[in-house]
């Protein structure tokens, strides 16, 4: 299978490392021509994960997304969700026909409130059975250091999903298979919002006791949203009860791709969403925090998208709702979190 990686940030670089560590040649779209020249000459990405050295014979680098798409059978999408439309906008309607797409995007398209598969279906008539996601608690920095990590691959067909996942399995990366394509994407979006909230709490100097209660309630709020949006009876986790009448298993969100990713994004110092939230809690304006971070915190745009979606589905979301108000409606972080406190259990 010919792989193409779309994106050149930390996560795209980590995924390129995983594939090439398995001896897989890749086509790699990188927007910046100077970064391409640097990788060819110095064997590493000058901006992201510079400790990762690549075997350049396995890299076909290009700043043309059309060329990378045309040369690939399976495309790994790893650009921030806000840039998807601009990145893929130059492609023809049939450019993705017969190809597989693996989404590594833990975000939602702003203004459109679409998951990547929904966008691809609308713009390219992309087939749902050819769409996969790769999610889970896996920071790019730890992949670069080859610390043992777990990634969950989701797709409609288990056999095909296992085949795609097999290209990513290494001695430092275990793969998990899951059929919940929509649920894992929404969970990844929500955990970025909640991690931003955890950062705000840290910036406001709440302690570990409060933070643990906040995150536990975030997990419950996430589960409620997933059920409201229609994600039901998914088979994840190891402790599941089967309804004796319907024989359907109850939803269990204690698997690594849901709860695990929430925990690591809320607690880890690698988390850009937590870092962004920490600055907001300390009194930074959104604009100043964005300039200081100099990377995309997906939770910022996601908070508005989820707010708009929740107007329709009406899930109980006091935590995500307040994070939205702090970021978008100029509610002060301190008084805002005081309003959250009574909801926590």
In which residue ranges do the predicted regions lie?
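Rossmann-like NAD(P)(H) cofactor-binding subdomain of soluble oxidoreductases
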Residues: 61-70, 74-148, 164-166
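NAD(P)+-binding Rossmann beta1-loop-alpha1 motif at the extreme N-terminus of oxidoreductases
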Residues: 1-52, 58-63
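Internal alpha-helical scaffold of NAD(P)-dependent oxidoreductase catalytic cores
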Residues: 83, 94, 123-129, 148-251
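Conserved active-site and cofactor/substrate-binding residues in soluble primary-metabolism enzymes
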Residues: 6, 10, 14, 34, ...
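NAD(P)-dependent Rossmann-like dehydrogenase/reductase catalytic/cofactor-binding core
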Residues: 191, 198-202, 206, 227-345
């Amino acid at each position: 299978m010919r792989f193409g990686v779309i994106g050149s940030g930390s996560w795209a670089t980590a995924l390129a490392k995983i594939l090439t560590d398995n001896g897989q040649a890749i086509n790699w779209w990188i927007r910046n021509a100077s970064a391409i020249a640097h990788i060819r000459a110095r064997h590493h990405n000058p901006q992201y994960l510079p400790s990762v050295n690549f075997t350049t014979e396995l890299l076909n680098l290009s700043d043309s997304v059309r060329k990378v798409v045309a040369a690939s059978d399976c495309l790994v999408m790893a650009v921030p969700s806000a840039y998807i439309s601009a990145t893929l906008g130059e492609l023809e309607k049939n450019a993705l026909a017969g190809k597989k797409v693996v989404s590594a995007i833990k975000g939602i398209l702003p203004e459109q409130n679409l998951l990547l598969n929904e966008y691809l279906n609308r713009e390219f008539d992309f087939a749902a059975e050819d769409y996969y996601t790769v999610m889970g608690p896996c920071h790019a920095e730890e992949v670069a250091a080859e610390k043992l990590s777990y990634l969950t691959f989701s797709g409609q067909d288990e056999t095909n999903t296992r085949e795609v996942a097999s290209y990513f399995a290494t001695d430092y990366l275990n793969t998990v298979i899951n059929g919940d394509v929509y649920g894992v994407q929404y969970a990844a979006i929500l955990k970025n919002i909640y991690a931003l909230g955890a950062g705000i709490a840290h910036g406001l100097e709440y302690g570990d006791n409060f933070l643990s209660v906040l995150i536990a309630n975030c997990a419950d709020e996430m589960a409620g949203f997933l059920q409201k949006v229609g994600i039901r009876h998914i088979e994840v986790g190891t402790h599941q009860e089967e309804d004796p009448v319907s024989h359907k298993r109850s939803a269990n969100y204690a698997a690594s791709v849901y709860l695990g990713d929430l925990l690591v994004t809320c607690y880890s110092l690698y988390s850009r969403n937590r870092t962004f939230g920490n600055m907001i809690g300390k009194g930074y304006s959104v604009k100043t925090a964005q300039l200081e971070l100099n990377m995309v915190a997906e939770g910022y745009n996601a908070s508005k998208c989820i707010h708009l979606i929740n107007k329709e589905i009406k899930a109980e979301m006091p935590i995500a709702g307040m994070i939205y108000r702090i970021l978008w409606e100029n509610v002060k972080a301190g008084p805002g979190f005081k309003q959250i406190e009574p909801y926590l259990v």
